[in-house]
Design a protein with these regions (language model features):
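Structural detector of coil-to-beta-strand junctions
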Residues: 67-70, 81, 155
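Acidic glycine-/aspartate-rich tracts in secreted/extracellular proteins
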Residues: 58-64, 77, 101-102, 128-130, ...
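Extracytoplasmic low-complexity segments
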Residues: 15-34, 42-48, 52, 63, ...
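Short structured motifs
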Residues: 36-41, 102-109, 163-165
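Sec-dependent N-terminal signal peptides
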Residues: 3-14
Length: 265
């Protein structure tokens, strides 16, 4: 009889365990009407004007007549320094704007925005002293563009085409963003190739060996890493690089950003 009396209590405790288990989400799912604001580029840099901006990203269903923007850098004069758009009617095409010039659409073999489970590493290497380079995974998709870019007073916006005072606010993103990285250097092609083959997110102690010794490599130039791993909805995206370049999520009325288990842990 004692065992029978304890059994309901044990079952109740077991149920509580199941209910309180937390799900760790790996990415954010944008469905229009939402964006993330980061700091002005000049305030985030350490020394040089050399940058590499990277996204692990996948597509999703589009419900708009506009071309969704993955990100934008718009300066204080409302000039688009750099932006990438996915073309609504094409699953393998992107359009890039550099220094307010819209380049012809680029068709890319192997790109499929209609597949929400296929994540791509998109890398932008830019500075005011060298021409811009853009990669999809380890393949250059804009290797010879003669454009130098001074993004100093531009604010990094992810998920839309936005200027700092939001008088421009359009082309909202549709799709998944798994991780964002910002480096204060132009990464080597070999580094980007290595990263594209290893989609796992950088761990908390990526700058250290197993023995706790600091690794002095290109990793020291990582000035922003936003892993987008959440256990609950938050409006602030913390920067795990140690430089406190946090981002803030904004949404229009009637819109939201969803937490998703898609992507790397």
């Amino acid at each position: 009889m004692r065992l029978l009396k304890l059994l309901p209590l044990l079952l109740m405790l077991s149920c509580i365990d199941l209910i309180t288990q937390k799900t760790v989400y790996n990415s954010l799912y944008f469905k229009g009407g939402s964006w993330v604001e980061f700091a002005v580029m000049d305030s985030m840099k350490l020394e040089s004007n050399d940058f590499t901006l990277q996204f692990w990203v996948a597509g999703g269903e589009v419900d708009t007549n506009e071309a969704p923007a993955l990100f934008s850098l718009v300066d204080s004069q409302d000039s688009i320094k750099l932006a990438l758009f996915r073309d609504k009617g094409q699953t393998n095409t992107i359009t890039i704007v550099i220094n307010s010039e819209t380049l012809p659409p680029i068709e890319i073999n192997g790109l499929d925005w209609s597949d929400p489970d296929n994540f791509y590493l998109i890398s932008f290497l830019f500075s005011d002293t060298a021409d811009i380079k853009i990669f999809l995974n380890d393949s250059p998709i804009l290797p010879t563009e003669e454009s130098r870019l001074n993004a100093g007073d531009s604010k990094l916006m992810v998920g839309a085409l936005v200027n700092e005072d939001r008088t421009i606010l359009e082309n909202f993103w549709y799709g998944y963003i798994d991780e964002i990285r910002l480096w204060n250097t132009r990464l080597a092609d070999s580094t980007i190739k290595f990263q594209s083959k290893h989609s796992d997110k950088m761990g908390e102690y990526y700058r250290y060996t197993m023995d706790g010794e600091e690794i002095f490599t290109y990793l020291n130039s990582l000035i922003g890493i936003w892993r987008l791993n959440f256990e609950e909805p938050l409006s602030v995206i913390e920067d795990d690089s140690g430089y406190n370049n946090d981002g803030i999520i904004y949404t229009r009325t009637g819109y939201s950003v969803e937490l998703s288990e898609k992507g790397a842990q």
